[in-house]
């Protein structure tokens, strides 16, 4: 059984990166984007669906980030919500090289927003749970 994690990250990256900068684990390079997606944690479980083959259930967390620089009440969660909607459209029929996607499920963990004296950061999350064969 081949670990599907890198194939899932590649499929997500290919689907999202043309619309929003997409990174694996952390922002890299010299750019400092204010809107981006991080392909964060991945978990997987083996489901022995029947005696002939295995299925994998793989959960991948997307961290959708929108940063507003400035002091005071800057920015709005609206842009982050719009990003989430767009990303859902981009990934809704995602296919994984070398696997058949049996089921797709989406979970939406609580938002994580923060403010400092110089910026406000809004973060939404989408957990994509794929059942693969």
Give short role names for the model-derived ranges:
Residues 33-43:
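A short, hydrophobic beta-strand-centered structural micro-motif
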Residues 1-29, 43-133:
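Charged, amphipathic alpha-helical segments and their flanking helix caps
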């Amino acid at each position: 059984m081949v670990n599907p994690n890198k194939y899932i990250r590649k499929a997500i990256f290919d689907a999202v990166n043309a619309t929003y900068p997409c990174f694996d684990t952390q922002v890299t390079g010299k750019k400092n984007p204010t809107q981006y997606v991080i392909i964060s944690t991945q978990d997987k479980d083996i489901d022995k669906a029947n005696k002939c083959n295995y299925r994998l259930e793989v959960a991948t967390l997307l961290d959708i980030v929108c940063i507003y620089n400035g002091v005071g009440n800057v920015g709005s969660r609206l842009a982050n919500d719009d990003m989430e909607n767009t990303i859902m459209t981009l990934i809704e029929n995602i296919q994984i090289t070398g696997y058949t996607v049996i089921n797709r499920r989406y979970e939406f963990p609580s938002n994580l927003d923060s403010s400092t004296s110089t910026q406000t950061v809004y973060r939404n999350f989408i957990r994509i749970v794929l059942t693969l064969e």
